[in-house]
Amino acid sequence: MAAAGDVILEDVPGSVNLFNTLQDQITKVTAHVQDLTQKVRSGIYNTDKGLSFLELKDQLLLFYLQDLTHLMLEKTNGKSIKGNPGILRLVELRTVLEKMRPIDQKLKYQIDKLVKAAVTGSLGENDPLRFKPNPQNLMSKLSEPDERESDSGEEGAEGGVAKKPQSKVKRYIPPRLAPVHYDDTEAEREHRIVERAKKLALSSSTIRELKEQYSDAPEEIREGRAYHMMRHDKEEQHRINHEESMMVRLNMTRKEKARKKRVLSMTSQLNSLTHFSDISALTGGEGRAEDMVPSMKKSKKGPKKSKKKKGFSRRRH
């Protein structure tokens, strides 16, 4: 019993200080609440358009403090709080407040912005909602009269009366491009043709077969289809997929039709078995630069002569 009495005596000074601090805080809170109540009743603070979420939160906190104060009063008077209904109400209110905390965190930005707008009467300078498109910026700020108005102004100046321009919209004048002569020397042209011939030679069938012959990489087994046919089939499949997906028919140009006809005819021609001129650009073979690149034959177009049917003419005697 003596040990319990010593513990109680040690806690008495701390308890007295807590009660004094609590009394001071209660006095300040009471004065603040009375001041707010008076301002709300007088119409200084308009609460008609308030947030229902904050109102609910304030009501729950008020009920929580009431029940907590009632339990403290019961314990101060030395009564038992076992089976007191206030405990169940505290647990329920505490659970609801804990469930409202994530919602409060999500609405914190909107609530702070609305409270600031209600206090200051306007949004902040750095508010993202202020940075919106301004249609006035689309108007032209150039003050230059049109040609008609300038002409009328000159006529008025000659007569002694000058008219002010009514419109300040500048007319768009496209830039004038002066033709420039294309300087291309014969050496540059030959060099460009040789480079093109080298690219064609590197992608030729002869170089590809030599690479496959002396390479250590595993050989790819193909089902007897030529490279140009595989490339043609791939392009044709891509074309078909595009037409089916876009629901449109693609027209073939004359160049594409000629290339398709040439590719299909290469499978039945045996004249190019001993033709090695496609790698002459790599071996340094002699010849003109024009001969290194296969040229496309252009069909000559000319006016068609109308053929008249020959018939027997009657001779008049």
From Swiss-Prot:
Which GO biological-process labels does this protein carry?
maturation of SSU-rRNA from tricistronic rRNA transcript (SSU-rRNA, 5.8S rRNA, LSU-rRNA); regulation of translation; ribosomal small subunit biogenesis
* A Pfam family of this chain: Sas10_Utp3
**Disulfide cysteine pairs (residue numbers):** none
> What coarse category fits the chief subcellular location reported for this protein?
nucleus
Biased amino acid composition, Acidic residues: 146-157
Entry's Gene Ontology cellular component terms? axon; chromosome, centromeric region; cytoplasm; dendrite; filopodium; nucleolus; small-subunit processome
Name the domain of life.
Eukaryota
Give compartment(s): Nucleus; Nucleus, Nucleolus; Chromosome, Centromere; Cytoplasm
Similarity comment text for this entry: Belongs to the SAS10 family.
Q: Output this protein's name.
A: Neuroguidin-A
Q: Which gene encodes it?
A: ngdn-a
